[in-house]
């Protein structure tokens, strides 16, 4: 595969991570550059790791991925989005959220990288070498996640608490989109 093809694949896979990073950037107060770096490392790392797991697992997990992965991604994103909305409505009145703990980052990273696992499986079936695509996918996702978190912070800074509700709705909407695509509704 050419560099351009791998780069475009990385962009496509990074869109969910970008949206979730932007949503996270809107809600975390106080926001630090280290928060954006944490998001970028988790999302970039998982987007790079999952194709490798798919490539190694190949056909052994292909049925599971195609049948259940969209449901898992939907469940994780709906749960996290619902939690964000609940916290915005009933949580800390100062609106300070620290949703970037490691367990939350892990769940978000898994939810946004399940499609990369399927890409790894397709690489295995096609006999595609894995190293170059994985490096490019991970780097593109790292940069997009970092930029998404910073952009989210800039936007969220103006809207304060209401943005956490919007962030939760974005995560739920992303989960619904993943599920709708799987069910061929869109």
From Swiss-Prot:
The keyword Cell membrane applies. Signal peptide: none annotated. One of its GO terms (cellular component) is plasma membrane. Disulfide bonds: none annotated. It comes from the Archaea. It is found in: Cell membrane. GO terms for molecular function: manganese ion transmembrane transporter activity. The chain crosses the membrane at residues 1-21, 41-61, 62-82, 105-127, 139-159, 163-183. InterPro entries: Mntp/YtaF (IPR003810), Put_MntP (IPR022929). The keyword Magnesium does not apply. It holds the Pfam family Mntp. It is a multi-pass membrane protein. Keywords: Cell membrane, Ion transport, Manganese, Membrane, Transmembrane, Transmembrane helix, Transport. Belongs to the MntP (TC 9.B.29) family. HAMAP family: MntP_pump. Probably functions as a manganese efflux pump. This is Putative manganese efflux pump MntP. The gene is mntP.
């Amino acid at each position: 595969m050419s560099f351009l093809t791998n780069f475009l694949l990385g962009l496509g896979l990074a869109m969910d991570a970008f949206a979730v990073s932007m949503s996270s950037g809107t809600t975390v107060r106080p926001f630090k550059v280290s928060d954006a770096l944490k998001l970028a490392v988790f999302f970039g790392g998982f987007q790079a790791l999952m194709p490798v797991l798919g490539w190694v697992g190949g056909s052994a997990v292909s049925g599971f991925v195609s049948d259940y992965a969209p449901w898992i991604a939907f469940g994780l994103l709906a749960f996290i989005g619902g939690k964000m909305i609940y916290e915005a409505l009933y949580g800390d009145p100062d609106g300070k959220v620290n949703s970037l703990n490691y367990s939350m980052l892990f769940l978000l990273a898994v939810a946004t990288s399940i499609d990369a696992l399927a890409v790894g499986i397709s690489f295995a079936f096609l006999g595609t070498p894995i190293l170059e695509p994985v490096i490019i996918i991970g780097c593109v996702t790292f940069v997009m996640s970092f930029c998404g978190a910073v952009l989210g912070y800039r936007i969220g800074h103006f809207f304060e608490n209401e943005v956490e509700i919007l962030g939760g709705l974005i995560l739920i909407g992303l989960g619904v989109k993943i599920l709708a695509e799987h069910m061929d509704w869109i």
